[in-house]
């Protein structure tokens, strides 16, 4: 057991180091995210002003916090649907992964999480600093909410990686998964609240979106860290994230085992 945990720890570190090899890309991502963040500030601040100082339950300060937190998470939460494991499934190299004494799904998710965590260093943290310095942000006043916010943030990253793994696992049955990835890219960002807070949606759409795992990937950690909920409310959101992670992880196991059987039947 201890050896297995150590191996997954090494995979996490390997993913982190892999992310560090793309420093110029990270810098480009930072510039792009800050630029779009400033555009969102202009648009959403105008919406707040037009609504009389509050829209969707967000005042100007909370809207700024939403903007910069969501932008800071862009490098770590995969809304594009692409992954290395998708390519390995497509070209058959995943058969080698199945020969290793590791769970393919867990190893993939852990590695992706390591890479995502690195992105917070050159992209996430600087964006929060820029947003806080030049625009202003509201932050939790309670240590408990801070802790729950960080936990929620980590759960969002893991849930994102686990959900993208499901997109890749469809490749056991489809020759090409780019169409699935495209649908995921369109739906996930919108439903996660990447463009506007989901509280600005019509009520029926907000309820429908809350029945998906996507708000747990961005909206819920932002809600907690923007100090919009009490400790009890934060605990509830974290519990929802844990439930979605368990469900997505379980479905990933089912698809992995079924995909492996299909691979063995077709490939010998």
Where are each of the predicted segments found?
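Hydrophobic transmembrane alpha-helices and immediately adjacent juxtamembrane helices
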Residues: 1-268
């Amino acid at each position: 057991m201890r050896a297995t945990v150590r191996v997954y720890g090494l995979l996490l570190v390997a993913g982190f180091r892999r992310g560090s090899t793309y420093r110029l890309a990270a810098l480009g991502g930072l510039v792009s995210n800050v630029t779009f963040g400033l555009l969102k500030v202009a648009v959403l601040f105008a919406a707040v002003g037009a609504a009389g100082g509050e829209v969707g339950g967000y005042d100007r300060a909370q809207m700024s916090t939403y903007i910069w937190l969501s932008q800071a998470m862009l490098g770590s939460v995969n809304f594009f649907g692409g992954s290395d494991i998708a390519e390995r499934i497509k070209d058959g190299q995943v058969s080698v992964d199945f020969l290793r004494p590791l769970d393919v799904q867990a190893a993939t998710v852990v590695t992706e999480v390591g890479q995502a965590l690195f992105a917070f260093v050159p992209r996430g943290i600087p964006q929060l600093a820029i947003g806080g310095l030049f625009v202003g942000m509201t932050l939790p006043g309670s240590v408990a909410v801070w802790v729950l916010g960080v936990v929620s943030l980590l759960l969002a990253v893991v849930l994102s990686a686990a959900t993208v793994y499901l997109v890749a696992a469809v490749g056991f049955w489809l020759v090409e998964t780019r169409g699935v990835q495209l649908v995921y890219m369109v739906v996930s960002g919108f439903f996660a609240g990447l463009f506007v807070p989901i509280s600005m949606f019509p009520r029926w759409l907000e309820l429908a979106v809350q029945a998906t795992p996507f708000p747990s990937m961005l909206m819920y950690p932002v809600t907690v860290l923007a100090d919009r909920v009490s400790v009890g409310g934060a605990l509830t959101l974290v519990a929802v994230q844990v439930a979605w992670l368990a469900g997505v992880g379980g479905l990933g196991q089912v698809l992995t085992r079924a995909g492996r059987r299909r691979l063995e039947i077709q490939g010998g």
